[in-house]
Amino acid sequence: VRIAVVGEPGGWSTERLAAALRAEGAEAAVVDLAVCALSLPAGGVAVGPRRLEGLDGAVVKKLGTSSARSTVGARINLLRALERSGVPVASAPERLAVAVDRYRMTLELAQAGLPMPETVVTDDVEEAVAAVRRFGTAVLKPLFTSKGRGMHRLRAGPDLVGILERHRADHGAPFYLQRFVPHPGRDLGVAVLGGRCLGAYWRVAAGDHWLTTILSGGRYAPAEPSPQVVEIAERAARHFGLLFTGVDLMETPDGGWVVLEVSAFGGFRGLGTALGLDAAPLVARAALARFSRPDRP
């Protein structure tokens, strides 16, 4: 069985997944979409002279390091082309395209009736300012980043328009604004494989930092969420139809929960650090099972 692991050559999680697939007896090679080419009408997706359409499957761990909208879109299109050549891809490119775009992801959360923070998306600076004033405190997020990159906590003030304009220059329009959810210095990550919870962990903020991400100095800690919270996470993951995902949730001051994000690519490090759980072999087996039944949702 020949499998491509789409990700970052030398990257810890990418190489860990490739090793797990090899341990299951697969011939696994890491494929970097940054060096792939699509030739049409004939030729398909290739890395140099090596064409990929004869593979038995492709597992997507990362799209690469760039969060530029055009780059992300181009790499999703490479995966679409690979899938159309007959190679099953996990997770499916159409589902990844929704999850990597924060705007589309939020539309899906709302459509599914999942609890989420109040959100405003607009190209207009005046509308953005009005949203910040209404929220009191807002979080401004780029559409195509993860791990807290490019996020700002905003309040109304004389520098607000300048911050919005700089954000637009750096990340483009529209402005994506959410009501800030006051929290006790942590949020919850739930890893979901094939629609079922693998485990959960807290991301605990450093000091009084409002961001809990590891890039902001946060740390992982084991968590045992209630069955009700697990059900919310599993429902969110199933709605997106991803093979392996992480669902980020935040507890609200009234004791409820909201879904912040559904990740296109579930992470291994939180499960390993907080719970001592090596998820790579589990993901490898799930991917191989899916490739043996390509009609499986």
Show which residues each predicted segment covers.
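Short acidic-glycine loop/turn motifs at beta-strand connectors
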Residues: 42, 192-196, 252-255
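Glycine-rich phosphate/pyrophosphate-binding beta-alpha loops
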Residues: 263-276
